[in-house]
Amino acid sequence: MRIVLVVDMFDEENNGTTMTARRFADMLRQRGHQVRVVSIGESGKDKFGVPEAHYKLVTRISHKQGFCFATPDEKVFRKAFKGADIVHFFLPFPFERKAAKIARQMGIPTSAAFHLQPENITYNIHCEKVELLSVGFYRFAHRYFYKDFNHIHCPSKFIAGELRKNGYKQKLYVISNGVDDEFRPMEVEKVTDPEKFNILMIGRLSYEKKQDILLK
């Protein structure tokens, strides 16, 4: 199949969505599929680059988390989508919304994933106790983007449950993001100091990950 992945960031390995998109592309290629990517960055073989978009206050906050928004470009979308069998989207932002509209105009099937957990946003703006904000985001994302998709990939049962709870009627597919093959069990000597214990934490060092609670 000729599969196009649309995601704001693909080149920088600094967030979970990007890492998932890169693994997804690698695995699909290993299975013989042709994979094209549309994202921020330089163009290259099967890569269609666009510039970064800036949204004033939102961009300043997103940069602190290592995330950048991509600029929608109809010409780039049409070039990347030509001859594609399906276009897959990872996030519900203006870049993806415009791309999805173009794909449908071209008669190409689309699918989407839900990788942006609202709680990640509310924690970073220190509004984690205002539950209505998370509920509002789930419902806004549905109206703004996901309502036009029939199939949504969820990286966890939790996300699938939250989508159902917030009115998503589409077919939901729970598929783990997976782990790279480079991560394998190792035989190492365990530290046996009775006054200490080892902690392994995988993920971003970020407020919503609550590393402070783990350490306490």
Give the role of each language-model region:
Residues G41, F158, G178:
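Carbohydrate-associated surface elements
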Residues V179-K196:
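Acidic anion/phosphate-binding donor-loop and adjacent secondary structure
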Residues V191-L215:
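Conserved donor-binding/catalytic core segment of Leloir-type glycosyltransferases
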Residues M1-G44, G49, K82:
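N-terminal subdomain of nucleotide-sugar transferases
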Residues Q105, L133-H151, N166:
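Membrane-proximal helix-turn-helix segments that form the acceptor-binding/catalytic region
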